[in-house]
Design a protein with these regions (language model features):
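Extended compositionally biased segments used for macromolecular assembly or nucleic-acid engagement
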Residues: 98-190
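A short, conserved structural fragment
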Residues: 65-78, 219-220, 286, 332-335
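Basic amphipathic alpha-helical segments that dock to polyanions
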Residues: 59-73, 212-214, 280, 331
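Accessory beta->alpha helical hairpin/"wing" motif in late/C-terminal subdomains of nucleic-acid enzymes
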Residues: 74-114
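Short Lys/Arg-enriched helix C-cap and helix-to-coil transition segments
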Residues: 217-234, 284-299, 335
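Short alpha-helical "recognition helix" segments of helix-turn-helix
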Residues: 24, 194-199, 262-264, 309-316
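Short, amphipathic alpha-helical "recognition" segments used to contact nucleic acids or chromatin
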Residues: 6-16, 175-189, 242-257, 295-307
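Short, amphipathic alpha-helical interface elements at domain boundaries
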Residues: 1-55, 138-154
Length: 335
């Protein structure tokens, strides 16, 4: 069993009841459907949400079949369920994941950072012609704007200092896994597979180790941005975490449109608009959204471990299901 199996089994085990492939895929890949956003919080797996955005459904299915053949998972009519008492270490090994909170930010930040390191290093080595390590045009545009009107020598020195501080202050367990991803001068950064082969570990250990350190750093930056001025400037806005449709709804809401007006303007079902507000509240815990229950009621609801929305409805009959979903995703903390 490798770290990917550990991740899959951990999510599955926390859900308690059988879960089908589409559900597991949306959680692991971080597809922000209304159901996925709600269930990730209901089953308290939001910290594990979206750690594998490039995951393919067929690949996940093949893994689940392997786990079934190994006797770790049972496949039932209602979905997959962990059927052994095997001890899992994913959360113990990686206690600081904040998957839902940093889902998009983590990957975009690291892409920005890798390209920034390459550009500044190549400038230092007077290397004018090279292939960008990141081909994404949005990332390239971000770094181009980031570099504008700045002294690149000063920038390079400051970035080096903050990277060194990252490794030192956060006591990064396996710094080589991070450092060897960077490119500059005549050195080309290694892939996850190349690093795994070099250090004789499985590739998923490298993958999750690097991602976990990025999440740890983002948490530190969020608490004390002034201590990481340059690295903080490479972190994309939290707004990028929202789906484009939810962002459109949020923009209308911030500009004074009420729920009915948004429904008319966007020509969407009210249930879809409600999904957007559930996603918005899950992303921004302080966001004011339509028909949000009061804070004391939200706290009361989230003091218990619920498995079904109808259980909450039975206990709080005056709330509709939209309000219940808002309360569920409002829970503070990442686990």
């Amino acid at each position: 069993m490798d770290k990917l199996d550990d991740y899959i089994l951990t999510v599955l085990k926390k859900c308690i009841t059988p879960r089908k492939l589409p559900f597991l895929y949306t959680i692991l890949a971080g597809r922000r459907t209304g159901q996925a956003v709600q269930d990730a919080h209901l089953f308290q797996v939001q910290h594990l949400f979206g750690l594998m955005p490039n995951l393919k459904s067929r690949f996940l299915e093949a893994r689940l079949i392997e786990l079934t053949d190994q006797g770790m998972v049972a496949s039932t009519e209602n979905g997959y369920i962990v059927q052994t008492d095997i001890e899992l270490f994913f959360e113990q090994d990686y206690p600081n994941f904040q998957g839902f909170a940093f889902q998009r930010q983590a990957f975009d930040f690291f892409a920005h950072l890798r390209l920034a390191v390459q550009v500044l290093s190549n400038k230092h080595h007077q290397k004018s012609y090279y292939l960008p390590i990141i081909r994404d045009k949005k990332v390239q545009g971000f770094i181009k704007n980031w570099l504008r009107n700045k002294d690149q020598t000063v920038l390079a020195n400051q970035l080096y200092e903050e990277l060194f501080e990252w490794i030192k202050k956060l006591n990064v367990a396996k710094p080589a896994f991070l450092i060897e991803r960077f490119s500059g001068g005549d050195l080309m950064g290694n892939t996850t597979e190349q690093i795994a082969a070099k250090y004789q570990v499985e590739k998923w250990e490298v993958y999750f180790e690097v991602l976990h350190e990025i999440h740890r750093l983002l948490a530190f930056i969020k608490k004390n941005p002034q201590d990481w001025a340059l690295l903080e400037s490479l972190v994309p806005s939290e707004i990028t975490a929202l789906t484009s449709s939810a962002l459109q709804t949020y923009t209308l809401w911030q500009n004074g449109a009420d729920l009915d007006t948004i429904e008319q303007i966007r020509n969407l079902k009210i249930s879809t608009i409600q999904d957007h507000f559930v996603e918005i509240r899950a992303t921004y815990k302080e966001a004011s959204v339509p028909y949000l229950p009061d804070e004391e009621l939200i706290k009361t609801i989230n003091q218990s471990n619920w498995r079904l929305l109808r259980e909450i409805k039975a206990a709080f009959p005056d709330l509709d299901y939209y309000q219940i979903r808002l309360a569920v995703v409002s829970k503070e903390g990442d686990k």
